């Protein structure tokens, strides 16, 4: 499974959204209905899945599906 597929699966699992809703440009809060707690849990799930540490100032920038994919790809 590619990084993109793994990130999208985490988003589907964490936010309880349909896979087809998880488009690259989708915003977690505006498009996928996440709240601030959801985004914190999403970052924690990404850290666990990819065994990376995401500093708070970086986590704040991860607001869309593509930004999550890009962050993981650049920090693995």
From Swiss-Prot:
Coiled coil: none annotated. This is Acyl carrier protein. GO terms for biological process: lipid A biosynthetic process. Pathway: Lipid metabolism; fatty acid biosynthesis. HAMAP family: Acyl_carrier. It comes from the Bacteria. GO terms for molecular function: acyl binding; acyl carrier activity. One of its GO terms (cellular component) is cytosol. Carrier of the growing fatty acid chain in fatty acid biosynthesis. Pfam families: PP-binding. The gene is acpP. 4'-phosphopantetheine is transferred from CoA to a specific serine of apo-ACP by AcpS. This modification is essential for activity because fatty acids are bound in thioester linkage to the sulfhydryl of the prosthetic group. Residues 1-76 form the Carrier domain. Keywords: Cytoplasm, Fatty acid biosynthesis, Fatty acid metabolism, Lipid biosynthesis, Lipid metabolism, Phosphopantetheine, Phosphoprotein. Belongs to the acyl carrier protein (ACP) family. InterPro entries: ACP, ACP-like_sf, PP-bd_ACP, Ppantetheine_attach_site. The modification O-(pantetheine 4'-phosphoryl)serine is found at residue 36.
């Amino acid at each position: 499974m590619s990084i993109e597929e793994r990130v999208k699966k985490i988003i589907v699992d964490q936010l309880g959204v349909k896979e087809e809703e998880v488009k690259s440009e989708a915003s977690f809060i505006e498009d996928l209905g996440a709240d601030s707690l959801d985004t914190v849990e999403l970052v924690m799930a990404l850290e666990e899945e990819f065994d990376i540490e995401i500093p708070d100032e970086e986590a704040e920038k991860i607001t869309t599906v593509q930004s999550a994919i890009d962050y993981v790809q650049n920090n693995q």
